[in-house]
Amino acid sequence: MCTYEGRPIIGKDEGDGCEGIIRRYTGGTKLQPQARVESLNNAIPVIPLEYIKNWLEHSTILSEESLEGTPYIVGAADQRVIAGKGQTVYARGQGIEVGQRYAIYREGEPYIVTDAEGKKQNLGLELTQVASAIAIRGENDMSTLEITDSYNSEVRRGYRVLPEYDAMLPTLFYPTHAQDVTGGGQVIRVQGSIGLAAKHSVVTIDRGTVDGVQSGYVFSVNQKGQEIRDPKTNEKLTLPTERIGNIMVFKTFDRVSYAYVLDSELPMNLGAKLSPSVVDE
């Protein structure tokens, strides 16, 4: 993190440090030689964009209801089971228009949580974009698409087809207080891991825009203490909850958000609780 006119800013370090980050933030304003720009030690570090780019560009979370009736892949040319860049696939469903670009998504696991009353809730279904395609033919409810790009995965039957939109990737994030977020919150998924997060990891939290969360919000992560036996009395004890790190939200959805682990003294477990974190001004 760097400071500009007394305000903390976060951006991608492209090898030129805070001077370059601020120059890009100000639209090319050249810093005067006497201006002193320095990183904030022991504060929020610059986030390398490559750590979160995949989730910014190719991941989304939608309600299962919103996916009802959307087109899906039913096959590929030459009876292929999988398809990649430059190949042709067929989709079934209404709404595909010839000449338009589409994103092809693999469905992940839904976010199922238990609320305070013990009832299970579905907070959304995670979708990962595996390819981009353009519709080249259409007849009734069957469309032919040509895959123009693929992203580290093949296209398979059953994958969803949704409109593709150009997204401007943010290069700066502003760390801000999370005081107005609906109380509670926890880590409900660790991306790319079976359940432990560390520094530079991406996690999903069960708070989204309906709870007041915005990109840039910083939370402290508090981990419940272990259950142990008293060595003298053999009583079952729970060690105190400890603050173990900080995360910053970088992409929000209705009921969940993606966050980047800024720092972590211990591995973060699923269920680790969130609390507002104070951002140094």
Please give the residue ranges for each predicted region.
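Surface-exposed, polar/charged interaction patches used for macromolecular assembly or partner binding
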Residues: 1-281
